[in-house]
Amino acid sequence: MVLIRVLANLLILQLSYAQKSSELVIGGDECNINEHPFLVALYDAWSGRFLCGGTLINPEWVLTAAHCDSKNFKMKLGAHSKKVLNEDEQIRNPKEKFICPNKKNDEVLDKDIMLIKLDSPVSYSEHIAPLSLPSSPPSVGSVCRIMGWGSITPVEETFPDVPHCANINLLDDVECKPGYPELLPEYRTLCAGVLQGGIDTCGFDSGTPLICNGQFQGIVSYGGHPCGQSRKPGIYTKVFDYNAWIQSIIAGNTAATCLP
């Protein structure tokens, strides 16, 4: 029965890509409750303050942005509304955290990826299921889905009760360079959004997935302030370039390094 529900949820996710890109994380529409079973909420263990998002990639592992690291945080899986709990929500602590050992700590954009091992495996359910690592790199022009509990207004931050979703496009790096002269090829990032502005991830969407043509291709990393500016699309960590590192860590090779 759980398998049937998981397959149904994945179908909803696929259908979401057929929608027009009129849904905004900034001032936009709520995600369907069944389209994000892999979405994880990271929050401060003491205050309960929401910190970041993440993505469940198997029963024991979550992928997020390195800049989301915090001393004391918990992870909530299977969540949708902050006020109304799903019956199958589960909470986990980080058992181990892995950041690329060759990351330049003074560069936020460099290797902005963190792999978290949960203190115990989660049980898959109607609202909890993984998102697989990408089998191939994304193509420029791909339709991509963004989602998160981050701000839905660009300047004065306004946070929604449920995650908001939007469709954007994967852009050529050349189109992003004018807005981000600090962006270097070795940062291994993707650029995605709408060049005229108005559709974007925003504050506290960090760590959430960029899903292009159904594949987990990026992690929300960086962007302009205020959010949604023209010529300033979002910057995402390119997950495909870290596949080998992720798989090595999960297999037990905790000394593995990322590509330069």
From Swiss-Prot:
Activity regulation field: Inhibited by alpha(2)-macroglobulin, diisopropylfluorophosphate (DFP) and PMSF. Low inhibition by tosyl-L-lysine chloromethyl ketone.
Ranges that cross the membrane: none
Residues at the catalytic site: 67, 112, 206
Function: Thrombin-like snake venom serine protease that clots fibrinogen (FGA) by releasing fibrinopeptide A. According to PubMed:8585090, only cleaves rabbit fibrinogen, whereas no specificity is described in PubMed:3910643 (tests done on bovine fibrinogen). Also acts as a C3 convertase that independently cleaves human C3 and kick-starts the complement cascade. Also increases urokinase-type plasminogen activator (PLAU) and plasminogen activator inhibitor (SERPINE1) in cultured bovine pulmonary artery endothelial cells. Dose-dependently inhibits collagen-induced platelet aggregation.
Protein's UniProt keywords contain Metal-binding: no
The name this protein goes by in its record: Thrombin-like enzyme flavoxobin
Reported tissue expression: Expressed by the venom gland.
Miscellaneous note of the record: Negative results: does not affect fibrinogen of human, monkey, bovine, dog, rat and guinea-pig. Does not release fibrinopeptide B.
Cystines in this chain: 31-165, 52-68, 100-258, 144-212, 176-191, 202-227
Entries under PROSITE patterns matching the protein: TRYPSIN_DOM, TRYPSIN_HIS
Principal subcellular localization: secreted
Peptidase S1 domain boundaries: 25-251
Family designation: Belongs to the peptidase S1 family. Snake venom subfamily.
Pfam families: Trypsin (PF00089)
Leader sequence residues: 1-18
Subcellular location: Secreted
Gene Ontology cellular component annotations, sorted alphabetically: extracellular region; secretory granule
Reactions performed catalytically: Selective cleavage of Arg-|-Xaa bond in fibrinogen, to form fibrin, and release fibrinopeptide A. The specificity of further degradation of fibrinogen varies with species origin of the enzyme
Name of the coding gene: TLF1
GO molecular function, one term: toxin activity
Subunit structure: Monomer.
Propeptide part(s) removed at maturation, as residue ranges: 19-24
